Amino acid sequence: MAMARVSLGRELIAGSLLAVSCAAGILAQDLASSLDTRGQSTVDGKTAPYLVRHLPVNAFPELPAAIQERLTRRGCMIPQTYEAHRPENVVHASLERRGSSDWAVLCSANGAVSLLVFLASGDGEATVVVTAPETSRLQMHAMSDVMGFNWAIDAATPEQIHEAQLDMHHPPPRVDHDGLADSVVEGKTVYRFFTHGAWTIVETQD
C-alpha cells in the first residue's frame, strides 16, 4: 500500500508539472501573439493582410539598463522583419567615433517606427534619425501570402562602407568608424553615417 501511495503521488506530481508546463507554454504563445500587429493594407494598388511581429525591450538583455528604461517609457516594441530567425533591429556599434559604444534601435510605438540612436556622449538620450508609419514598411514575400515588415538595421563597418563605394569613379577616403546599414529586405541598402554632429547618408554612386 505504501508503495502504491508513493507511485500515485509521483504520478500526481508529474501530472501537475505537465499541466503547469503546458499552461506556461500557452501563456508565452498568447503573450507573443499580443505583441503582433495584424490588419489589412493596400500596397501597389493591392489590398492584402499583414502581420508585423514585435519583441519587447527586455528580449534584448544586452541593452544597457538606462536605454531599456527610456525605450520602455516611449512605449517601444522592437519590430522584426518577416525573415527574422533571431532577435534583430537592435545594433551595438561605434557610431559616433572610433571606439565609442553606441546603440541604434528600431522602436515601434503608436503605429510609427522610429530609428533611434543612443550615443555614448548623449547621457542616454535618443536621437530620432528617421520615422515612418509602420504600414509603409510592408511588403509581400515568398514565405507567405501575408505582408510582413521589411525594415532592417545592422552595423556597417568602415570596410563595408568602403566596398559599397568602390563603383564610384572617385571613391572618397575610407571612413574611420562604423555606420548603420539601413535596409529594405531583398531590396536597397543605404548607409547612414554620423559626422560633424549630424547624421548623413553616405554617397555610393557618382
What are these regions (language model features)?
Residues 13-25:
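Bacterial N-terminal signal peptides
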